[in-house]
Amino acid sequence: ERTMTKDNNLLGKFELSGIPPAPRGVPQIEVTFDIDANGILNVSAVDKATGKENKITITNDKGRLSKEEIDRMINEADRYKSEDEKQKNRICAKNSLESYVYSMKQSVEGDEMKDKISESDRKNRILSKCEETIRWMDNNQLAEKEEFEEKKSELEKVCMPIITAMNRAGGGVPSGMPGGMPGAGGGGGKGPTIEEVD
């Protein structure tokens, strides 16, 4: 019932290991939840690049809560709903900033853009602002949603004019750019796709 995993009842856990190192955002892990008619939960995770897989089966006797415990948790979920929503929005803003800064950094460090942006703009403006933002994030993990949004806006103000000028000069938008172009919906993404299977 709750947004944060720490506030829910743990039924079991497993680890998917052996994923090769890759740039942030590159690994794709497909997680599938399947509940059968008997209440047995099967969870599997597959690394799409390597095919490595792990799974767990949770029978309906593991981690069972009493009726009173379930009612208590539902009441807590209702009581903390607005706090949970605020926390969720804060984390989404943090993730959006983090995704944007690392995507921008990776894009301007890549070969595709090195020749299209001046060394001064690349190093002294974009990469410098990215590093400053990363340091700020490291020191402000518990910042509010508005603070994360403000930092993203500051970074976009530095990056947008340079990328726009590159586009006007015929450079085109590199494929790794967040949202196709900074500020164009970069960072948040669509989120997970959930498919229901009978």
From Swiss-Prot:
UniProt biased composition (Gly residues): 170-191
InterPro entries for the chain: HSP70_C_sf, HSP70_peptide-bd_sf, Hsp_70_fam
Region (Disordered): 170-198
GO MF annotation, one: ATP-dependent protein folding chaperone
Any Pfam family the entry gives: HSP70
Alphabetical keyword list: ATP-binding, Nucleotide-binding, Stress response
Keyword ATP-binding applies: yes
Keyword Isomerase among record annotations: no
Family membership: Belongs to the heat shock protein 70 family.
Protein name: Heat shock 70 kDa protein
Source organism phylogeny: Eukaryota, Metazoa, Spiralia, Lophotrochozoa, Platyhelminthes
